[in-house]
Amino acid sequence: PDPLWSLQPRSDREAGDAVTSNFAFHAFPAKVSKASMAWNYSFWLGTISAALFLLLILSGAPLLFLYVPSVERAYASIKDIEYVVTFGSWLRSVHRVGAHLMVVVVALHLVRVFLTGAYKNGPGRGQHREWNWLMGIVMLLLTLFLSFTGYLLPWDQLAYWAVTVGTNIAS
């Protein structure tokens, strides 16, 4: 028996069905202690990061159609968004501030999960949360990567030096 499954699936399809059919239980679990829902315990950082992700999708979709991803036009398209597009400056600011907040909230969420030990096995039999921790680390790295790439999009002097420093760190 696989120690990572509380359910012992007989096939890959049954395992996949178990994951997809129980996905909603993550958002609406059957048992939740009052202590885990207290503001001073969780600070609702996971919910806030999900809300910020939704904000970034909603503010990023219009920017996706307005931005021109070329070395020659990147800076000019940012200026067009700022000064020509109606509410463009506001939209870009909402997206930028949301991205900064997302990095901070996701990092705080990681620290909170680590300090409270929420990544360890749950109270029920067969609840293995180590995979949740690994998925959280992957999502943190993805958040940092996307934040870095968004930082480069204007392709101005600041972005140029960010690429220079980033590639030097990577090498």
Write out the residue ranges for each language-model feature:
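Membrane-embedded alpha-helical bundles that constitute the cytochrome b-like, heme-associated redox core
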Residues: 1-171
